[in-house]
Amino acid sequence: MRCPKCNYNKSSVVDSRQAEDGNTIRRRRECEKCHTRFTTFERLEELPLLVVKKDGTREQFSRDKILNGVVQSAQKRPVSSTDIENLISRIEQKVRANYENEVSSTAIGNLVMEELAELDEITYVRFASVYKSFKDVDEIEALLQQITNRVRGKKKSSIDDETH
């Protein structure tokens, strides 16, 4: 590894540990010539994953594209950037674990909606309203009814757990 200060190409690893995301190794290195310490990150190189859009075109999987959609949907909501980053990481892990070369944009959208439903219902509705391209109020009302039923089901099961 080349030293960022003197450009010497030999360094020794002083410390090595797994980074917070679990997919990266963080290494502290020391230049053998000028003794400058610097940090490097080692990450598994992943094969490119293509997203097949609804019109049949293909584009490279973009974590940032998902991030932008979720951030926009979560505006003025009590959702932290850490929550969003963790959500995006879970989605990317699921996509890479379940699809080798190609994944449909519909599958990604459904994964995002599943994750958002657990994170924040308003963010979920905002994302769904754009993703699903609702044609009328009845479709939005049906989505809200699904959420209401799911929330009631969770509350009922937690009450049942407390009484037993």
UniProtKB/Swiss-Prot annotation:
Protein's name according to its UniProt entry: Transcriptional repressor NrdR
Matching Pfam families: ATP-cone, Zn_ribbon_NrdR
Entry function: Negatively regulates transcription of bacterial ribonucleotide reductase nrd genes and operons by binding to NrdR-boxes.
Position of the signal peptide: none
Organism whose genome encodes this protein: Streptococcus uberis (strain ATCC BAA-854 / 0140J)
Cofactor note: Binds 1 zinc ion.
Tree of life domain: Bacteria
Biological process per Gene Ontology, one example term: negative regulation of DNA-templated transcription
NCBIfam families: transcriptional regulator NrdR
Domain ATP-cone: 49-139
Stored InterPro entries: ATP-cone_dom, NrdR-like_N, RNR_NrdR-like
Cofactor: Zn(2+)
Keywords, in A-Z order: ATP-binding, DNA-binding, Metal-binding, Nucleotide-binding, Repressor, Transcription, Transcription regulation, Zinc, Zinc-finger
